Amino acid sequence: MWGALRSVLRPCSRASVPRQRAYHGDAVARLGTQPDSGSSTYQENYEQMKALVNQLHERAQYVRLGGSEKARARHTSRGKLLPRDRIDNLIDPGSPFLEFSQFAGYKLYGEEEVPAGGIITGIGRVSGVECMIVANDATVKGGTYYPVTVKKHVRAQEIALQNRLPCIYLVDSGGANLPRQADTFPDRDHFGRIFYNQAIMSSKNITQIAVVMGSCTAGGAYVPAMADENIIVQRQGTIFLAGPPLVKAATGEEVSAEDLGGADLHCRRSGVTDHYALDDHHALHLTRKVVRSLNYQKKLDVTVEPSEEPLFPADELYGIVGANLKRSFDVREVIARIVDGSRFNEFKALYGDTLVTGFARIFGYPVGIIGNNGVLFSESAKKGAHFVQLCCQRNIPLLFLQNITGFMVGKDYEAEGIAKDGAKMVAAVSCAKVPKITVIIGGSYGAGNYGMCGRAYSPRFLYMWPNARISVMGGEQAATVLATVARDQRAREGKQFSSAEEAALKEPIIKRFEEEGNPYYSSARLWDDGIIDPVDTRLVLGLSISAALNAPIQRTDFGIFRM
């Protein structure tokens, strides 16, 4: 049978092999053009973006230090590794660590600094397995949990649950920050949610590993107690529901922290802990052994091809995009600098051209890309919804490159059904079960944020460039709307609204929107998973897609699309 089939497929000896024709699609399969680096626009963009990137790296370096010099010295004098050194010693040598929410808590509590929110979270490869790592930083307020610390810890667990990543908790915390207990303890997504998430993930066979390297007090004691497997460091790690001061106050009993909840007690008597470590290095070595014992196998739902570098240097993104959001650029030039071989199989290239859609690969992984090239019209929205459906049908992860002012407005567009067409795209994005990743590379305004998979639409990961802006609308537009409302109100009262009054009304509104739309304002509140250097976008996306594919891709069911 197979021989007969091969003979059918073999070309006849007398037939001539048809000459390969060149088509328009072949010519545009590789994206990108060489920018005019000598132009004033390119140079201005480059300088502005480079300044923002330099600021990003300076601020990140400060955050990475953690607590004060005195706090760090006190920490290391006890024989402890600093939290970032713990992570470096835990992950596989030479492998990257994809850190999240580095600017959590940035300028959030006034004069009270909480670098990185007092906790470090991210994905690292441990014994060959991609793991979510959550490390308390005891140099920042004793590792106590501020409201933003809780939010960041819970977000890390959400990422782990969505992507089925084993969790490793490097515990060194004094528990909840008591002066802020009202914002850390009672609500659904407060401190208790951490332990709820541990239980749920363990029930779904997502391994939970705790390494007690310092204090583990009160409710925090449940982190190791609810772990699948745990490790404690001698004369350093302690676990108790009530510390020595509270025990004395409640019972009059005087006891040391070591006798109350140290490694000897929990490894030899209580059975709360499983492995006895001599120091931090030994504890991390044991952790790697635990991960090796998981018998973990990653099963991909996609085909992976050999990776290719883009044809264009990544730093050209600085000159192409820039910091001026009023200056337009072709999102294809961005795509050309992040995808394999700068290859892009564009979908519906001639229709709804303010939205660019198509297929590419990043580090060999398939991805469907949706990028903005202007305001969204009905055609753009319908095209976007169609493309999302294709990716869901084919199990292809989605990447959204946001630079959007919103959907088109006006009488004619309302009459043509922009509301229902925009709703199609929003519904498709909402229901899509393939991994979704969003990068805000410019503006993210209003309903455009919804259609392009903003935070509310559960992207697995959401990143911002340092030039990005996010708000319900631009500051000038908001100020104009509110000034119009004020003018109309005055008119109804038979009063005038002077130009000076209008300017006085607008100025603080514009200033407030500028402040609240800033990426650092967003990142401080965990509206995103981190601000990234545009040059690092390709690597960050590759790591994110790889992590997302640890979870099986679920079938997508769509609801009603209003036609």
Curated annotation (Swiss-Prot):
PANTHER family: ACETYL, PROPIONYL, PYRUVATE, AND GLUTACONYL CARBOXYLASE-RELATED (PTHR22855), METHYLCROTONOYL-COA CARBOXYLASE BETA CHAIN, MITOCHONDRIAL (PTHR22855:SF13). Residues 49-306 form the CoA carboxyltransferase N-terminal domain. Carboxyltransferase subunit of the 3-methylcrotonyl-CoA carboxylase, an enzyme that catalyzes the conversion of 3-methylcrotonyl-CoA to 3-methylglutaconyl-CoA, a critical step for leucine and isovaleric acid catabolism. Its main location: mitochondrion. Its EC number is 6.4.1.4. Residues 343-372 are annotated as: Acyl-CoA binding. Probably a dodecamer composed of six biotin-containing alpha subunits (MCCC1) and six beta (MCCC2) subunits. It is found in: Mitochondrion matrix. This is Methylcrotonoyl-CoA carboxylase beta chain, mitochondrial. The modification N6-acetyllysine is found at K70, K495, K511. Pathway: Amino-acid degradation; L-leucine degradation; (S)-3-hydroxy-3-methylglutaryl-CoA from 3-isovaleryl-CoA: step 2/3. The keyword Transit peptide applies. The modification N6-succinyllysine is found at K70, K141, K433, K495. One of its GO terms (biological process) is coenzyme A metabolic process. InterPro entries: AcCoA_carboxyl_beta (IPR034733), ClpP/crotonase-like_dom_sf (IPR029045), COA_CT_C (IPR011763), COA_CT_N (IPR011762), MCCB/AccD1-like (IPR045190). Residues 309-555 form the CoA carboxyltransferase C-terminal domain. It comes from the Eukaryota. One of its GO terms (cellular component) is methylcrotonoyl-CoA carboxylase complex. Belongs to the AccD/PCCB family. Keywords: Acetylation, ATP-binding, Ligase, Mitochondrion, Nucleotide-binding, Transit peptide. Residues 49-555 are annotated as: Carboxyltransferase. Residues 1-22 form a transit peptide. It comes from Rattus norvegicus (Rat). Gene3D superfamilies: 2-enoyl-CoA Hydratase, Chain A, domain 1.
